[in-house]
């Protein structure tokens, strides 16, 4: 999926769209997506000016956005139809290495279970094959419009 198709499945826009490309997707099972981390990201102005590191909460958000794409595509729904995926929880979050400008963040999510619009995913974010973050992410699909 290129950025144009991603924008059909995620309501997020600059500066909060954190998925640049999807390279693999198996509906109801797994997704592999990428975030290219650039020094031009607005959060690097304050986190930290002399040692820029991507905030951990934004790594979690990037993984959650990949989960949202997988969920939306699996159930064949779109934000344009009035649906949204909320990040409602995260468990067992661990950060293993910093993510810095120039890194390409690989986002992997696997469905643990999904029932009545509540989804749980096992997620990993890696840089050059090295684990940066892992978490279980819970999302809720809701009709908002």
UniProtKB/Swiss-Prot annotation:
Gene Ontology biological-process annotations: fatty acid biosynthetic process; lipid A biosynthetic process
Enzyme type, top EC level: lyase
SUPFAM superfamilies hit by this protein: Thioesterase/thiol ester dehydrase-isomerase
Catalytic activity: a (3R)-hydroxyacyl-[ACP] = a (2E)-enoyl-[ACP] + H2O
Keyword annotations: Cytoplasm, Lipid A biosynthesis, Lipid biosynthesis, Lipid metabolism, Lyase
Compartments where found: Cytoplasm
Domain of life per record: Bacteria
UniProt GO MF annotations: (3R)-hydroxyacyl-[acyl-carrier-protein] dehydratase activity
Catalytic residues (UniProt): 47
InterPro entries in the record: FabA_FabZ (IPR013114), FabZ (IPR010084), HotDog_dom_sf (IPR029069)
A GO cellular component entry from the record: membrane
Entry keyword Zinc: no
Documented EC number(s): 4.2.1.59
Function: Involved in unsaturated fatty acids biosynthesis. Catalyzes the dehydration of short chain beta-hydroxyacyl-ACPs and long chain saturated and unsaturated beta-hydroxyacyl-ACPs.
Family named by the database record: Belongs to the thioester dehydratase family. FabZ subfamily.
Protein name as it appears in the record: 3-hydroxyacyl-[acyl-carrier-protein] dehydratase FabZ
Species per Swiss-Prot/TrEMBL record: Chromohalobacter salexigens (strain ATCC BAA-138 / DSM 3043 / CIP 106854 / NCIMB 13768 / 1H11)
Gene: fabZ
